[in-house]
């Protein structure tokens, strides 16, 4: 019984150490989008944007609104590309 408890404790410790080693640093964490808006959102509501990370199942742009909401959008849509260009110019 003591051997099995020791083995279990050892395995749990290994699992925790392994999961911590595979995590990305907090500064590199990105949010993934699983759905995106289909309608254009008003540009006046948008403060900035970021792209989803490489590990996400689908590519998306995440717009941050002035009220603090995050809205996912399809980067292939023309209005999304125009918003990105505008926001990039404003940040220069």
UniProtKB/Swiss-Prot annotation:
Cellular component GO terms, alphabetical: extracellular space
Keyword match Repeat: no
Pfam families named in the record: IL8
Source taxon at top rank: Eukaryota
Location of this chain's protein in the cell: Secreted
Signal peptide: 1-21
Coiled-coil region(s): none
Transmembrane domains' residue ranges: none
Main location: secreted
Keywords annotated in UniProt: Chemotaxis, Cytokine, Disulfide bond, Heparin-binding, Inflammatory response, Secreted, Signal
Swiss-Prot/TrEMBL GO biological process terms: antimicrobial humoral immune response mediated by antimicrobial peptide; chemokine-mediated signaling pathway; eosinophil chemotaxis; inflammatory response; positive regulation of cell migration
Tissue: Plasma serum.
GO MF annotation: an example: chemokine activity
Cysteine disulfide partners in this protein: 32-56, 33-72
Family from the record: Belongs to the intercrine beta (chemokine CC) family.
Physiological role: Chemotactic activity for neutrophils and lymphocytes. Binds to heparin.
Protein name: Regakine-1
Organism of provenance: Bos taurus
